[in-house]
């Protein structure tokens, strides 16, 4: 996957003994970042030291450094990898001084608790060798591109997570999946993105190490070198946050746009909206510890709050991020926004009518926010083989797509990898990606075997409660004081009635007529004494993705099966004769 990543990880062999394998990343990751920044800063080190001597005010210094070097960050220490080893006795103190003298926006090493690791390495007698090993690797962007550096981080993090046996729900997003998501996200806006000097904002509330942000920028600049994409993100894992922030720093972005913290309980960009939003939240990871704060926000924010439509079960927080993204899209009156999110299959169908998940789907569909859902191949992620889906949201749809949702079955568009990377044995090649994008672009003209376009109301249904009378010992209905038959709770049943039953296109407005028609046709002929409890009718929405792409495979003819059985029986009899003979 990454020759550089493999080489850097091999440095961890020096840590054997004092460190366990699941602790290697605590050393390797911050040293990799430090060396990358060290190489970037090297050409202007003397200039920055002179400026630091002339300007004591940090804000003035930052402005002058930006003017002189073009970079928003700097380091004023007299030490670097070039001279750290010259003072063997002072290595620990000098390295700490070097880390301490980065500009205030370079706070990434605090999130690794890096000083503690420096002290531990010195005590173990390993610090000199580690510094020497990293000093021998040139990580300057002219030598190692941002893409290659991203691959190296991806490799190191995967090795670290394998050793640490990280939570299965926390998945590093492979680059082939990100590229597809980015292409789909920008697909409807490609014409706009070629305008001269455009400025667009992109936001990832689960930024991880910044892979999505980096590839989105790469995509935009490939289309329009003069475009400027302002990147924003938030990340709760300290190490991932540090990597993401340092990567953006290295590229010259405003590091203050990357925030540390829990997006669900403390939105660092509250009140902000963005042109493009994207996320790959953890799958099936519970949010019980945040439930109190999330519920409080839902109750206090009112009907327009981000969690107002509903809350999913505390066992899986994916749909909270889905709601969050929907509220982060730029308002339609300001040009609208688009969002892309990768999730597993649960958000498509989990939860009964009027449950939290169903109400979230209802809000998204009745608000006409869901533009497309793409099923990805299985075995796409490094530590899980589960089925995953890309949801594309748009609050300002193209007129042809209004009121419609496109489902794309991309499960067969994959290429086998030469070598598995954990659970990842498949990748979406450029050709595979182009085929999926063609299906998206063709829309209603796309191959129906792989693409379906449905009205929003086709995902809706009503759950009706069907009652039957309670009978006395003589078999007669028991009635209440108003002479109405009492229901028998043991015979109570429920039925799901699609909005579209009987060819209805009225959607929610057809409730009474469609339900009555369904009841008269599907229920009454079988249980003539039944009735509907109209007070218990519930509205639900689900997206039965696989059902829409189900292909009936008829069973083999009986004669063919019998012939096969006869052949097998004959073989067994021949073997028995050989044994007896």
Please name every model-derived segment.
Residues 14, 23-36, 181, 241, ...:
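Conserved Class I SAM-dependent methyltransferase catalytic core
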Residues 131-132, 161, 254-258, 299-305, ...:
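Short acidic (Asp/Glu) and glycine-rich catalytic loops that position anionic groups and cofactors
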Residues 290, 382-472:
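Flexible, glycine-/basic-rich loop-and-beta segments that form/coincide
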Residues 273-274, 316-318, 334-344, 370-371, ...:
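Active-site lining segments that contact anionic ligands and/or coordinate catalytic metals
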Residues 168-279, 283-296, 319, 344-346, ...:
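Conserved S-adenosyl-L-methionine
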Residues 1-190, 257-268, 375-378, 402-409, ...:
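Non-catalytic, mostly N-terminal accessory regions of nucleic-acid modification and defense proteins
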Residues 286, 290-315:
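Conserved catalytic motifs of ABC-family nucleotide-binding domains
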Residues 214, 242, 279-281, 319-323, ...:
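Feature representing long, continuous alpha-helical segments
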């Amino acid at each position: 996957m990454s020759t550089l990543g493999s080489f850097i990880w091999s440095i961890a062999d020096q840590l054997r003994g004092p460190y366990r394998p699941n602790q290697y990343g605590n050393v390797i990751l911050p040293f990799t970042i430090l060396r990358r920044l060290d190489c970037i800063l090297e050409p202007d080190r003397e200039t920055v030291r002179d400026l630091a001597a002339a300007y004591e005010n940090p804000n003035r210094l930052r402005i002058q450094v930006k003017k002189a070097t073009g970079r928003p960050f700097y380091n004023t220490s007299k030490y670097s990898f070039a001279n750290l080893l010259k003072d063997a006795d002072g290595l620990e103190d000098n390295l700490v001084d070097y880390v301490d003298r980065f500009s205030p926006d370079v706070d990434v090493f605090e999130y690794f608790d890096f000083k503690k690791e420096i002290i531990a390495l010195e005590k173990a007698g390993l610090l000199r060798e580690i510094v020497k090993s990293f000093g021998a690797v040139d990580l300057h962007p002219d030598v190692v591109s941002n893409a290659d550096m991203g691959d190296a981080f991806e490799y190191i993090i995967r090795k670290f997570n394998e050793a640490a046996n990280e939570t299965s729900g926390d998945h590093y997003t492979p680059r082939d999946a990100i590229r597809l998501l980015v292409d789909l996200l920008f697909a409807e806006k490609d014409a706009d993105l070629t305008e001269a000097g455009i400025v667009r904002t992109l936001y990832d509330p689960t930024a991880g190490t910044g892979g999505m942000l980096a590839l989105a920028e790469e995509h935009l600049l490939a289309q329009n070198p003069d475009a400027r994409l302002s990147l924003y993100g938030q990340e709760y894992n300290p190490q991932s946050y540090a990597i993401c922030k340092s990567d953006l720093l290295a590229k010259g972005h405003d590091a203050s746009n990357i925030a540390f913290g829990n997006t669900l309980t403390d939105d660092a960009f509250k009140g902000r909206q963005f042109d493009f939003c994207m996320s790959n939240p953890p799958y099936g990871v519970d949010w019980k510890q945040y439930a109190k704060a999330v519920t409080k926000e839902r109750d206090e924010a009112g009907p327009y709050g981000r969690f107002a439509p509903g809350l999913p079960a505390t066992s899986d927080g994916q749909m909270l991020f889905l709601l969050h993204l929907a509220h982060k899209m730029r308002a339609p009156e300001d040009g609208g926004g688009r969002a892309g999110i990768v999730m597993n299959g649960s958000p498509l169908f989990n939860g009964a009518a009027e449950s939290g998940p169903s109400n979230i789907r209802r809000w998204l569909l009745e608000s006409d926010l869901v533009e497309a859902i793409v099923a990805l191949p299985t075995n796409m992620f490094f530590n899980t083989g589960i089925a995953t889906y890309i949801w594309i949201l748009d609050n300002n749809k193209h007129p042809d797509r209004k009121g419609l949702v496109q489902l794309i079955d991309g499960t067969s568009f994959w290429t086998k990898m030469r070598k598995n990377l954990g659970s990842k044995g498949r990748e979406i090649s450029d050709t595979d990606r182009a085929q999926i994008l063609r299906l998206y672009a063709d829309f209603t003209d796309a191959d129906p075997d792989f693409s379906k376009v449905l009205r929003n109301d086709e995902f809706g249904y009503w759950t009706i409660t069907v009652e039957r009378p309670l009978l006395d010992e003589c078999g007669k209905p028991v009635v209440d004081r108003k002479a109405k038959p009492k229901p028998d709770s043991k015979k109570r049943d429920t039925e799901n009635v699609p909005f579209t039953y009987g060819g209805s296109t009225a959607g929610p407005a057809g409730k009474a007529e469609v339900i009555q028609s369904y009841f008269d046709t599907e229920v009454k002929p079988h249980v003539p004494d039944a009735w509907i409890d109209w007070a218990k009718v519930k509205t639900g929405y689900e997206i039965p993705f696989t059902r829409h792409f189900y292909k009936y495979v008829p069973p083999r003819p009986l004669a063919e099966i019998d012939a096969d059985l006869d052949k097998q029986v004959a073989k067994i009899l021949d073997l028995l004769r050989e044994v007896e003979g």
